[in-house]
A protein has these predicted regions:
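Ligand-binding "clamshell"
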Residues: 91-103, 116-118, 191, 196, ...
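Short, polar/charged alpha-helical segment
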Residues: 29, 37-59
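Ligand-binding clefts/hinges and TM-proximal coupling segments of bilobed small-molecule sensing domains
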Residues: 136-162, 242-268
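Alpha-to-beta junction loops
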Residues: 74-84, 128, 151, 172-176, ...
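Pocket-flanking alpha-helical
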Residues: 66-97, 119, 204-206
């Protein structure tokens, strides 16, 4: 009987020891949602390795739209996401009574005006249709890009982060605007002829930033962020995410594999 007890104790110790080792090997799991394309790549190849060095087990979940990543984060299915700017996040919070918080900017691919019909801005004919993002924040980016290109003039009284057609005081080429979900905009380059495509969707569709007729002059508020739940502000996870983005390893990957991305000023 004494031998059986000793055997059982020994077996239990081995099981417990194995469980502890497995937990230590896996580390704390952190689940990050990212839009398909360059930001999923950034999460996988620039952010994940640094977090794993910090002891985390990292899971990356890819999304093909701008709706699911915030819903999943607000519902607790994600610990963080990487796809949006602060204005988009604030709009989601207001509309959904959520408490998402941005913690650090990341290098961001600029929006570009792409065309299958015209080779230069000067070639654009009067009355041409232009596709641009449906959501107000990113459509504002589109309008500002058109203004910087000299195609339209926006009223000085306009809210630069909520521009609509009523704010356009000069439309030199009588452009007509078609609003679409951001994920459809790469296809609109061929279907419509002119399309303002956010950089992440352009790259995900194997378009080159250099092929755009013009690229946006990115406002600080339009740079993408890592976003977490308000309850996690002040947590070790928040600190580790910030440290990962600020790390030399992260920025080496950005410099090598994400050329053309607009970097936060402190990183330039």
């Amino acid at each position: 009987m004494r031998g059986i007890i000793i055997f059982l104790i020994g077996t239990l110790a081995v099981i417990l020891g194995t469980s502890i080792l497995l937990y230590e090997d896996e580390g704390e799991v952190i689940t990050i949602g990212a839009s398909s394309g360059p930001f999923a790549d950034m999460a996988s190849f620039a952010l994940k390795p640094v977090l794993e060095e910090q002891g985390y087990s990292v899971e990356i979940v890819e999304y093909s739209d701008y709706i699911q990543p915030n819903n999943a984060l607000a519902n607790g299915d994600l610990d963080a996401n990487l796809f949006q700017n602060v204005l988009f996040m604030e709009s989601f919070n207001e509309e959904n009574d959520a408490d998402l918080k941005n913690i650090i900017q990341v290098p961001t691919a600029p929006m570009g005006l792409y065309s299958s019909e015209f080779s230069t801005l000067e070639d654009i004919t009067s009355g041409s249709e232009v596709a641009l993002p449906l959501d107000p924040v990113n459509s504002s980016r589109g309008f500002l890009t058109l203004q910087d290109a000299g195609l339209i003039t926006i009223s000085e009284d306009a809210d630069m982060f909520a521009i609509d057609e009523a704010d356009i005081i000069n439309n030199k080429k009588n452009l007509e605007f078609i609003y679409q979900d951001a994920g459809q905009l790469p296809r609109s380059v061929e279907q419509i002829g002119l399309s303002l495509v956010p950089g992440n969707f352009a790259l995900a569709s194997e378009m080159k930033l250099d092929d755009a007729l013009t690229l946006e002059n990115m406002n600080e508020n339009f740079r993408n962020q890592i976003v977490i739940n308000g309850d996690d502000i002040g947590s070790k996870m928040e600190e580790d995410l910030i440290n990962a983005v600020e790390s030399e390893e992260f920025n080496e990957v950005i410099d090598a594999d994400f050329k053309g991305f607009d970097k936060p000023e402190e990183d330039e």
